[in-house]
Regions:
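Non-heme Fe(II)-dependent double-stranded beta-helix
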Residues: 1-17, 23-124
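Short, conserved beta-strand element in jelly-roll/cupin
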Residues: 117-138
């Protein structure tokens, strides 16, 4: 973390202690509406057997194929949040569009960290952070 500027220490501490922070209304309504339209269209074009196969986890589409999501990935207000907590060099690794059916079981987050042999894997500072945007009420 950079020491030469003001850091949102409260949010950073919350991230370390709880594992998450909530930042409401990061996206503009215009971008949010565009993403909602595109993701809704993508999810409605999936074959029924695809939806049946992933009934409990929901649909998971890679965000890598959708140009509109590049704007979301590079969204300046979101990157400013990271910078405000001292994460100055954010990079993008991967992204998913997840669509779950109402009343389906809740999901758990799981990621197999690829760098357990690196000493930084055991430091308090997170090695990876992700943004999760809810496009509809849950």
């Amino acid at each position: 973390m950079k020491k030469d500027r003001t850091v949102d220490q409260e949010r950073y501490d919350q991230l370390l202690s709880l594992g998450y922070c909530v930042f409401p209304q990061v996206l503009s309504e215009e971008l949010l509406d565009a993403i909602r339209c595109q993701t809704e269209a993508l999810c409605t074009t999936l074959p029924a057997e695809e939806n049946d196969r992933h009934r409990s986890q929901g649909t998971m589409l890679s965000a890598m194929s959708f140009p509109l999501l590049a704007e979301l990935i590079a969204w300046r207000p979101a990157l400013a949040i990271l910078e405000g907590m001292g994460f100055d060099h954010a990079t993008f690794t991967d992204g998913y569009i997840i669509s779950k059916f109402p009343q389906s079981p809740r999901l758990f987050w799981h990621y197999d960290w690829f760098a357990w042999s690196d000493p930084s894997a055991y430091a308090p500072k997170p090695q990876q952070i992700f943004f999760m945007y809810y496009l509809s009420d849950t």
